[in-house]
Amino acid sequence: MAKYLAQIIVMGVQVVGRAFARALRQEFAASQAAADARGRAGHQSAAASNLSGLSLQEAQQILNVSKLSPEEVQKNYEHLFKVNDKSVGGSFYLQSKVVRAKERLDEELRIQAQEDREKGQKPKT
């Protein structure tokens, strides 16, 4: 009886161990595929987010832009910067957020232009 119980326990541990190993391999493969999909631009964009303290989405929300167009970014930046000027009753905190958002979007535009040059395409403007 004890012999059979020991065999059942050993078989159960083997099954669970194999399942765990298979799940671990699948998770590793999925994380590698996701990293490959992000590519090199993802690393640059993440580095830009770390430097400015804002993600790309946050910067777009602050400046109210949906597409990365240098003209639209500049227009919205100038408007929000003037509106939040402390001399007209604005907030220095909000004005600094606007500046950081503009810096972040300018960095993203620079990264895109660099990628376009590397691909031999005309930069988007």
Swiss-Prot record:
Keywords: Membrane, Mitochondrion, Mitochondrion inner membrane, Phosphoprotein, Protein transport, Translocation, Transport
Phosphoprotein recorded as keyword: yes
Source organism, top-level taxon: Eukaryota
Membrane association type: Peripheral membrane protein
GO BP field: DNA biosynthetic process; negative regulation of apoptotic signaling pathway; ossification; protein import into mitochondrial matrix
Gene3D superfamilies found in the cross-reference section: DnaJ domain
Subcellular location: Mitochondrion inner membrane
InterPro entries (UniProt xref): J_dom_sf (IPR036869), Tim16 (IPR005341)
Positions where Phosphoserine occurs in the chain: 69
One GO cellular component term noted in the UniProt record for this chain: mitochondrial inner membrane
Reported tissue expression: Expressed in trabecular bone and cartilage and by differentiated chondrocytes localized in the hypertrophic zone and by osteoblasts at early developmental stages.
Keyword flag Signal: no
Main location: mitochondrion
Stretches for region J-like: 58-110
Subunit structure: Probable component of the PAM complex at least composed of a mitochondrial HSP70 protein, GRPEL1 or GRPEL2, TIMM44, TIMM16/PAM16 and TIMM14/DNAJC19. Interacts with DNAJC19. Directly interacts with DNAJC15; this interaction counteracts DNAJC15-dependent stimulation of HSPA9 ATPase activity. Associates with the TIM23 complex.
Family, similarity comment: Belongs to the TIM16/PAM16 family.
Function per UniProt: Regulates ATP-dependent protein translocation into the mitochondrial matrix. Inhibits DNAJC19 stimulation of HSPA9/Mortalin ATPase activity.
Domain notes: The J-like region, although related to the J domain does not have co-chaperone activity.
Protein name, per record: Mitochondrial import inner membrane translocase subunit TIM16
